[in-house]
């Protein structure tokens, strides 16, 4: 299948999805977690890849995935139905502000759009997937705070500036950094992304570095260990 990306336990069809599988998404799917997670929510699921990775990693969890784009939601639903853990996955076509579940989640994840107030992408659907405005992060945090259990964790991946914006806004809701993974392309390059975990614990944050490449075309052992349960190449 031309638009398919095969993982060890499932396959992702990317047909009709404005945002295709990328390093940000698979890293978040491999890193985000909470001990004994029972109810998981993926906000802005796209192809469904993060939700599927979490369903694989947490075999006793129920995973809900919300997607605002109708075509992407249809594709994610197809991918979920074709997965071996389809019985624990549910994809919903909804904006996050309209999603009102009757339960709390102990693990929420999001790989959100991040070009805040930038030039909008000329293709509307890619614009929705990649760009946002100043109010988006506020709406996201408001909904996360309303849906997250008191001992739950919210994980996201963003460039540094946008990650700091969310961290600053999260204080209003009593959420603070628990874990920060600083991502570099290699050990000689500056940080390009942060995976951040927010929770209500008030404990000091744990900081770690991840380097993707050890040399030209060579992945680091740490990167391969993170993704060895998913990527066929590892």
Swiss-Prot record:
Superkingdom of origin: Bacteria
Function summary: Specifically methylates the adenine in position 37 of tRNA(1)(Val) (anticodon cmo5UAC).
Entry's EC annotation: 2.1.1.223
Native source species: Pedobacter heparinus (strain ATCC 13125 / DSM 2366 / CIP 104194 / JCM 7457 / NBRC 12017 / NCIMB 9290 / NRRL B-14731 / HIM 762-3)
Location of this chain's protein in the cell: Cytoplasm
Protein name: tRNA1(Val) (adenine(37)-N6)-methyltransferase
A Pfam family hit: MTS
Catalytic reaction list: adenosine(37) in tRNA1(Val) + S-adenosyl-L-methionine = N(6)-methyladenosine(37) in tRNA1(Val) + S-adenosyl-L-homocysteine + H(+)
EC main group: transferase
